[in-house]
Regions:
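Cytosolic, long alpha-helical scaffolding segments
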Residues: 1-399
Length: 399
């Protein structure tokens, strides 16, 4: 076993959890780019994650020496099963590209305007990022973008760490807010992206509706996973209840999508293009189901094994929650004005206002005193977000 390979239950759980979230991002990116090489890499990463989970299950079973131990270990195996289901679903999404099942061009256009967009850019000669480490570049806080992967020739580096160095000619695969796309392209020495052109010809209304539903299912799946892990880390039943709502919504959307796809088939130029929609929808629903499973212990008021909490605190993206205080910098300002993602690197999963939740609020969403923010991102960004939401404290005068 390599020195940097995870060795114990906690390390294996961290590696599997991080891999599951990366798999979701890469799978949808493979669909967006219609990239068979990237889809194949998703398959390889999923196999690696399966290896982590097999070792985790073996070590967890060996650690149970009493009925009390077994009850605690059961929660570890339960979470491992949910993570495994997420990986399987992501792999199913990638296989749509590998199997050439067909993806309508409307879907790729809509994915470019999803809550989080993916993109790729080649590093030009003399670019600002050339020869610099990711730690030095601080891309999440400077642009709001996370690097999913770096491709150098035919080699891929997934989920690159802070010591990874970007070189001229590298292809960066990134994800984040739409307003950050041209920021990272500028740093890579690439020209800005032009506004998306209007699609030619009158679109099929039934197909457009099916595509819109699928993009909503994608957004729901990504939010559900983030909220599920956050509910587990904070032992928060309110977050678990929101995951349940998202899972129920996903079931409804899946039924709706199947109906619209069947209606679109009669007018579609190539009905085979609709097969990919059905496969991606089923996989997206499966991700929501797995997210619901992750929240089971929180939902039922039972404490999972402490190693799960320890693992969640050590993952690459940290969960954070904070409340907007009266007189804070955040109060009365929109997310766009605060530039939360580009300034702090934190992605807002949800905002709770009273008893109502707003998932993945848009840039125009204005924060009010008392709003509870649930976000994910780098540890340094979590501290910056908290500072924005705290009212200035008067300095203590001399005694």
């Amino acid at each position: 076993m390599a020195d940097d390979e995870p060795r114990n239950v906690k390390e294996l759980l961290v590696a599997a959890k991080d891999a599951s979230e990366l798999l979701i991002d890469l799978a949808y990116a493979a669909v967006l780019f219609d990239d068979e090489d990237l889809a194949h890499e998703v398959e390889i990463l999923e196999e690696r994650m399966d290896g982590y989970l097999r070792r985790l299950r073996t070590l967890a079973i060996l650690a149970a020496r009493s009925p009390e131990d077994a009850e605690g270990i059961e929660s570890v195996l339960w979470i491992a099963g949910a993570i495994d289901q997420i990986g399987d679903a992501a792999s199913d999404i990638a296989r749509v590209v590998e199997a050439k099942l067909g993806i309508p061009h409307q879907l790729r256009a809509d994915l470019r305007h999803a809550d989080e967009v993916a993109g790729r850019v080649k590093v030009r000669e003399g670019a600002l990022v050339g020869g610099r480490s990711l730690r030095n570049l601080s891309l999440p806080t400077e642009t709001g973008m996370w690097l999913l992967a770096i491709r150098r020739g035919r080699d891929w580096e997934f989920d690159p760490g802070p010591d990874s160095v970007v070189s001229e000619g590298d292809v960066l695969v990134y994800q984040g807010p739409e307003e950050g796309m041209n920021l990272i392209r500028e740093m890579a020495g690439a020209p800005p992206l032009p506004p998306s052109p209007e699609s030619g010809g009158p679109p099929l209304s039934e197909l457009d509706r099916a595509v819109d539903i699928l993009v909503e299912m994608k957004n729901a799946a990504e939010v559900a996973v983030g909220l599920a892990y956050s509910s587990l880390m904070f032992n928060d039943r309110a977050l678990a209840a929101e995951v349940e709502m998202l899972e129920t919504r996903s079931d409804f959307l899946h039924d709706e999508l199947e109906s619209w796809v069947l209606r679109a088939a009669a007018e579609a130029r190539n009905p085979d293009d609709l097969r990919g929609l059905l496969r991606i929808a089923a996989a997206s629903e499966s991700i929501c189901d797995a997210a619901r499973d992750i929240t089971w212990y929180v939902e039922h008021g039972e404490r999972p094994h402490p190693v799960i909490q320890m693992a969640l605190e050590e993952t690459e993206e940290t969960g954070a929650e904070t409340v907007v205080e009266t007189g804070s910098q955040a109060e009365g300002h929109s997310l766009r004005q605060l530039r939360l993602q580009t300034e702090t690197g934190m992605f807002v999963l949800a905002v709770q206002r009273g008893r109502r939740w707003v998932y993945r609020p848009r840039g125009r969403f204005s924060l009010q005193a008392g709003d509870r923010i649930v976000a994910i991102g780098p540890e340094a960004g979590a501290k910056e977000l908290d500072a924005l939401c705290r009212a200035a404290r008067p300095e203590a005068g001399p005694n």
